[in-house]
């Protein structure tokens, strides 16, 4: 039996539907972040937990170009002369975990230059320095906001001297947006280790933990102590000025400050290390 194609689905109709589909928002990236059964020591080595955390491998500009959130105006590297190949300019693995009190963040990064000098320094201008920031919405909702209630950015400047602005918190609160302040000292612990593999003075390992109650709980009263199955919003922003001003950016799982574009971070139970088969 042959079914007739309705007139509204003939070429003009197909074009209309294709155009309509292109206007629909892309499905949010989903990542599953395991609970850590033992709290790691924050010392600039991820050895205790890197195999038990969320990570999805190495990111460089070529991989980012294939991602659904890629925007060349935002995801970019900069050319200041005598640059290495793009994959050597910046590539990184990022790690996340959680327990009843903390979110844990890690990064293992190959970078050709460590640059934490801002020509027009302000404490809040982490994005003009080498920095890795985790944008977290907790709990995730369906409202499009830019650093409104429930939105947080935990930003770690890659400076082992740990200046007062080295662990920065951009966040919202009920009725307020873009609040800027250091992460409360009692709520954060982090370490930066430069040149950990003896390869380049720009390489680094970042390890950090942020206590959730005085940060996420302050940003949104709807936050509650974490449970398996909770859904947060997430984006990673890695800034890389390389001696310039604003410089390069990697954006993962999102398209910028609008939390409606951020990925879904699902809290799960503990993970097991990757198993190697005997044959």
Give, region by region, the residue ranges found by the protein language model.
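Structural preference for beta-rich elements and adjacent junctions enriched in aromatics
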Residues: 27-279
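Glycine-centered signal
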Residues: 6, 23-25
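N-terminal secretory signal peptides that target proteins for export/translocation
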Residues: 1-9
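Bacterial N-terminal signal peptides
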Residues: 11-22
């Amino acid at each position: 039996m042959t079914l007739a194609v309705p007139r509204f689905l003939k070429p003009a109709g197909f074009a209309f539907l294709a155009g309509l589909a292109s206007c629909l928002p892309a499905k949010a990236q989903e990542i599953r972040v395991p609970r850590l059964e033992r709290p790691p020591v924050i010392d600039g080595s991820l050895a205790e937990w890197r195999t038990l955390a969320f990570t999805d491998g190495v990111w460089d500009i070529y991989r980012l170009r294939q991602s659904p959130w890629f925007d060349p105006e935002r995801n970019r590297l900069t050319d200041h002369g005598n640059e290495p190949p793009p994959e050597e300019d910046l590539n990184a693995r990022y790690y996340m975990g959680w327990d009843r009190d903390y979110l844990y963040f890690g990064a293992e990064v190959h970078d050709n230059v460590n640059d934490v000098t801002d020509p027009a320094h302000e404490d809040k201008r982490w994005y003009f320095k080498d920095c890795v920031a985790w944008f977290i919405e907790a709990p995730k909702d369906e409202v499009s906001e830019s650093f409104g209630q429930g939105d947080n950015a935990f930003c770690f400047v890659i400076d082992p001297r740990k200046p007062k602005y080295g662990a920065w918190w951009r966040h919202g609160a009920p009725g307020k947006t873009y609040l800027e302040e250091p992460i409360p000292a009692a709520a954060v612990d982090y370490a930066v280790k430069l040149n950990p593999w003896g390869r380049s003075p720009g390489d680094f390992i970042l390890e950090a933990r942020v206590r959730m109650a005085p940060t996420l709980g302050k940003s949104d009263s709807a936050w509650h102590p974490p449970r398996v199955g909770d859904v947060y919003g997430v984006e990673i922003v890695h800034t890389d000025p390389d001696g310039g001003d604003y410089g390069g950016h990697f954006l993962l799982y999102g398209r910028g400050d609008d939390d409606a574009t951020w990925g879904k971070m699902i809290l799960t139970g503990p993970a097991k290390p990757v198993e190697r088969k005997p044959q």
